[in-house]
């Protein structure tokens, strides 16, 4: 079992997730909050783009195309993943500097 919330050391002084964070709309001023984990693989898969990312507000968009169920409408699991992602990111921003903000 791995601990995805405890800080890890980086191998270089450059931000290891810079390209990923920029691609998903995270402002550079907020990159330190995601230094060790980036945005995660599911954010990549669902193509979630953050339109607001600050301690007071986290917002994002996600395309319906590619995230549908068999009837062509947005999959409920994709909706739940978007909501959980926003909640986790908000917790990370509010819990910065504390152990395991989840």
Task: For the regions a language model picked out, list residue spans one by one.
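Terminal targeting signals and extreme-terminal segments of soluble enzymes
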Residues: 1-102
